[in-house]
């Protein structure tokens, strides 16, 4: 398990309610450490990507490297309602600043988990996590079917990789790789903030055939149209990779990110969209990105991240 650490398992602790027996279990009671030998019953495998090197390169506010541990701490005391096992397979770090190597290790880990029948849920880290996550799925599938990428995000993250990869380049990197291997780049970005993306980025999204919806068009009234759009996108996909940049949420709900949203998309809109994606039966991989515990207020952002993890593991 190259550069993965299991030392964080001590954070899985919380309240005990013995008077209610098995019905009072919480996440910390059920999460299992990844077995160092042998095989595990297929389930959800948490993978920490404790890296914000891409955020630093993108001139953002660093701190997201601490997110996997902080999310676990809030998740540990959450009530347990799942029916399949959940494993914690540890954290991958990028202390040496070698993001390419970190991406390669994450891709290897994700591919291995998928090969063993697990659902990998990656806890970032900056949104540079997406390139490693996608590469793991790509390696696992080896050209078997079309992958649709659904990104809830205020930003396209389609910046060109001029010198180095960053948290702003992952989907352009994926597009380049798709071109190189002769596979379609099928990308949806939901929650785009016009003020956070230049005209050049909108033009690039159009040129790449990206389906995007601006934050102002994501409301309760527009939910039926959004679900219909998702249906069309998913119908053109054999497999779905879901990535959630937490800065898509309103800044009042999600202050703990490098770039809080002035408007954002409400959780009440995002949750049914996630459920709709899950109901398709095509979701193979998911990750959360950009939570920065250094910028959080009273753990508000961590609680939202933990809630999303809970939903993604149902």
UniProtKB/Swiss-Prot annotation:
SUPFAM superfamilies: Arginase/deacetylase. The keyword Ribosomal protein does not apply. Mn(2+) 1 binds at residues 127, 153, 157, 245. InterPro entries: HutG, Ureohydrolase, Ureohydrolase_dom_sf. Binds 2 manganese ions per subunit. Mn(2+) 2 binds at residues 153, 155, 245, 247. Belongs to the arginase family. This is Formimidoylglutamase. It comes from Aeromonas salmonicida (strain A449). The lineage of its organism: Bacteria, Pseudomonadati, Pseudomonadota, Gammaproteobacteria, Aeromonadales.
């Amino acid at each position: 398990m190259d550069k993965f650490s299991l030392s964080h398992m001590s954070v899985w602790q919380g309240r005990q309610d013995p008077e209610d027996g098995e019905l009072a279990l919480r996440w910390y009671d059920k999460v299992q450490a990844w077995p160092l030998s042998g095989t595990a019953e297929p389930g959800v495998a948490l993978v920490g990507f404790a890296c914000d090197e891409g955020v630093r390169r993108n001139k953002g506010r660093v701190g997201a490297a601490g997110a996997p541990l902080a999310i676990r701490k809030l998740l540990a005391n959450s009530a347990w309602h799942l029916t399949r096992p959940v494993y914690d397979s540890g954290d991958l770090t990028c202390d040496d600043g070698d993001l390419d190597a970190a991406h390669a290790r994450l891709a290897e880990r994700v591919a291995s988990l998928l090969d063993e029948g697990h659902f990998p849920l990656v806890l970032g880290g900056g949104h540079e996590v997406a390139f490693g996550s996608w590469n793991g799925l790509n390696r696992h599938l080896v050209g078997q079917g079309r992958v649709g990428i659904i990104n809830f995000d205020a930003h396209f993250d389609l910046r060109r990789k001029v010198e180095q990869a960053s948290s702003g380049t992952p989907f352009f990197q994926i597009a380049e790789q798709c071109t190189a291997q002769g596979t379609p780049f099928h990308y949806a970005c939901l929650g785009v903030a016009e003020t956070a993306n230049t005209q050049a980025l909108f033009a690039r999204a159009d040129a790449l055939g990206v389906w995007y919806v601006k934050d102002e068009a994501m409301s309760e009234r527009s939910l039926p149209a959004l679900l219909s759009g998702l249906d069309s996108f998913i119908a053109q996909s054999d497999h779905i990779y879901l990535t959630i940049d937490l800065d898509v949420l309103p800044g009042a709900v999600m202050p703990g990110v490098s770039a809080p949203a002035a408007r954002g998309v409400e959780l009440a809109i995002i949750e049914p969209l996630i459920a709709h994606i899950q109901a398709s039966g095509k979701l193979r991989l998911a990750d959360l990105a950009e939570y920065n515990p250094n910028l959080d207020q009273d753990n508000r952002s961590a609680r939202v991240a933990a809630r999303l993890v809970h939903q993604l593991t149902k």
